[in-house]
Amino acid sequence: SDVYKRQARTCGELLRPVTLELGGKSAAILLDDVDLAANIEGLFQATLLNNGQTCVANTRILVPRSRYQETIDTFATLMSGAVIGDPLDPQTQVGPLVSDTHRTRVEKFIAGSQEQGARLVTGGSRPAQLDTGWFVEPTLFADVDPASTLGQEEVFGPVLAMMPYDTIEEAIAIANSTKYGLAGTIWTADEARGQDIARQIQSGTVGVNYYMLDPVAPFGGIKASGLGREFGPEGLASCQQLQTIYLATT
């Protein structure tokens, strides 16, 4: 974020327009009527795509307390059984991180989350079967404080934070409680209800039972997640300079 702030300052000094797509700490909100079995693959993609190394990763999972343990168990089974390995192998579900330096950063998040009281459910280590490569096991924390470091900061790795909620108003408040506003999802059997909740999320893009960017629709963030839009007519408009020509009518 500091780098992008410097870029924005430089563009301001030069009076140059700029589009900035920055980080995110997006939330997947599961409603009480969600069909976990039907949606778990979509949730896996939304939360752990590219090993969590995507700006739109929904790395906070907000779950109604009545479905909390069930959801923890479902995710733990999926994540602990994920195939880790060569990203060129079609069977691989979780590949390496981008560098050794970044893996060290992710591991510091994991250690710090335990120190701050989050409950480690699965993962948290380097996979024992892989002695080369910058791998980290898919890691799930439960009982994460929304105000903690893991609840607020972008990890950019395969580390998920699960949090219970008691009312949908509380879930919306938690989802909106970070400095970011890039993405998010709502998971429910009632699509109309999901759309209503999506409109209350302070985020540039929100999916209902699905998340995938579409180049015909504008993409971008609000708050600390960026300025401007990519894709769609709005993205093209940012590359244009308008000119008005006036003609006399007499």
Language-model-detected regions and their locations in the chain:
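ALDH superfamily catalytic-core signature
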Residues: 2-145, 208
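Conserved C-terminal structural/oligomerization subdomain of aldehyde/semialdehyde dehydrogenase
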Residues: 29, 77, 83, 94, ...
